[in-house]
């Protein structure tokens, strides 16, 4: 059976929300180097949204990626963001603006952005899902999905009402796995129940799992020399239903590190899983994540 990930080369993606900056502008030279390194290492999945860097992320992708490489060299994901639409008639002009900003004539994936109970109600009321599915039928989108920020029961409702959804992007990392407010594990299990492949955002929890408390750092230092980010990203990528893990990289150094351990991906081994469990226990003990009871 054909999968929406058939043309995605590896399970690691370039999240373009924290690109390197020069003052208030994206550093195109540095970003181009990052794009080149990413593609040269065999990766091809890029993720953006109109709101990232106040619209500059899309423009940077046109300048650093889409104008420099053939269309078949990359997979590009964009999103329908609620900030920019109030009625159905707003959707197609906004979508066209995104295509032009990115310099492409179709998106490989297009996600309903940051869906929660309230935004889902807004999108339903304006028939946004139906419009995006029509764009898919017209060939302007290859695959249609959602990015999601709410409780698992809301996700279950959305996937029940719209079984046409092909992919779900969720916040997922080892600290949020059992967090009662994020419900990473429960959301992942809902996706599996509905047979939807998962894309992971925030695998390092906005950097929190890179800059660890001293006690937690000592635990990871006892492993075999991988970076803190490597253990967090590999944790997420080790789950069978997770097809893509995004990282919002902001430098060539971060890109080199991440490409190094994801190029020939290996799931966490037992020693590493036990170390991650100890780090989570330290976080809970310091009140940095809620106890699950």
What are these regions (language model features)?
Residues 22-23, 29, 36, 85-204, ...:
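Glycine/proline-rich, positively charged
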Residues 29, 36-39, 43-44, 63, ...:
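Structured C-terminal cap/extension of enzyme domains
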Residues 1-74, 105, 131, 137:
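N-terminal binding-site loop/beta-alpha segment at the start of enzyme catalytic domains
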Residues 45-52, 142-146, 244-246:
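Short catalytic-loop micro-motif centered on adjacent basic/acidic residues
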Residues 52, 56, 149-150, 250:
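Short beta->alpha linker loops
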Residues 52, 68-88, 113:
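Structural motif corresponding to the early beta-alpha repeats
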């Amino acid at each position: 059976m054909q999968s929406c990930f058939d043309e995605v080369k590896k399970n690691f993606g370039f999240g373009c929300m924290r690109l390197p900056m020069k003052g208030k502008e994206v550093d195109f030279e540095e970003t181009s180097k990052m794009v080149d390194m990413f593609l040269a290492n065999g990766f091809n999945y890029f993720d953006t949204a109109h709101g990232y860097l106040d619209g500059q992320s899309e423009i940077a992708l046109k300048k650093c990626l889409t104008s420099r490489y053939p269309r078949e060299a990359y997979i590009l994901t964009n999103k329908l963001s609620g900030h920019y639409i109030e009625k159905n008639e707003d959707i197609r002009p906004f979508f066209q603006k995104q295509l032009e900003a990115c310099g492409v004539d179709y998106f490989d994936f297009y996600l309903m952005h940051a869906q929660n109970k309230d935004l889902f109600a807004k999108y339903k009321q304006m028939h946004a899902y139906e419009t995006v599915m029509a764009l898919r039928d017209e060939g302007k989108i290859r695959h249609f999905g959602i990015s999601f920020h709410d409780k698992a029961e809301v996700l279950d409702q959305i996937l029940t009402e719209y079984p046409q959804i092909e992919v779900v992007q969720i916040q997922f990392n080892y600290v949020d796995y059992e967090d009662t407010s994020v419900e990473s594990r429960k959301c992942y299990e809902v996706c599996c129940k509905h047979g939807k492949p998962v894309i992971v955002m925030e695998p390092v929890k906005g950097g929190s799992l890179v800059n660890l408390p001293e006690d937690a750092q000592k635990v990871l230092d006892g492993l075999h020399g991988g970076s803190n980010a490597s253990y967090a990203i590999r944790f997420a990528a080790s789950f069978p239903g997770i097809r893509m893990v995004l990282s919002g990289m902001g430098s060539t150094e971060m890109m080199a590190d991440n490409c190094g351990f994801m190029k020939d991906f290996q799931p966490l081994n037992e020693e590493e899983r036990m170390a991650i469990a100890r780090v989570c226990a330290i976080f809970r003990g310091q009140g940095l994540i809620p106890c699950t009871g």
